[in-house]
A protein has these predicted regions:
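Membrane-embedded and extracytoplasmic architecture of multi-pass membrane proteins
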Residues: 1-168
Length: 168
């Protein structure tokens, strides 16, 4: 992204970088992370079986396995995002890039990816697992599990971005 001498607002830069992230996602086969999430979801769900929510210990073990899958999927989404573009980011920063805009664009784009992965995880796991019918918080068990999966995947994704920003 070329920044001229005129100052480009942070919001405009976020939009520019969201477009860049989308192009990279499509052209560099970033969509493979969705397939990776689907494969991990299927493997974990097959191993857990349909009795996961029947017995307490199976529920604990299954919950741990599903959340572990969320963490792995989230970290692998973003672990290399920043470090592979380090030279480009430095050059663009000298040309006027606000680092906060760059990070915000990554956070927004990765949130969208994490929403898709949470939906994939819930959809695939529901084919193999029998989720409970009662939902104490929001009245819908699907919504509760979707929010839980999304928050776990997104937290791990942000951790991956932080690691990527630190590593040279």
């Amino acid at each position: 992204v070329h920044m001229s001498n005129t100052q480009v607002s942070r919001i405009t830069q976020i939009g520019i970088y969201l477009g860049k992230h989308w192009r990279l996602f499509i052209n560099e086969r970033g969509w493979k992370v969705l397939i990776f999430g689907a494969v991990i979801s299927a493997l974990v769900s097959i191993v857990l079986g349909s009795g996961m929510f029947v017995y307490t210990m199976d529920t604990f073990s299954g919950g741990f396995a599903l959340i572990s899958a969320c963490i792995w999927v989230g970290i692998f989404n973003s672990i290399q995002n920043i470090c592979k573009e380090r030279a480009i980011i430095k050059r663009e920063h000298r040309a006027g890039l606000h680092i906060s805009s760059y990070i915000a664009s990554h956070l927004i784009f990765q949130a969208g990816i994490c929403l898709l992965q949470a939906a994939i995880l819930l959809g695939i796991s529901s084919a193999f697992l029998t989720y409970p019918s009662c939902a104490p918080l929001f009245g819908g068990v699907w919504l509760e599990y979707f929010i839980t999966y999304f928050l776990c995947i997104y937290a791990a994704d942000v951790l991956g971005l932080a690691i990527s920003a630190i590593v040279k």
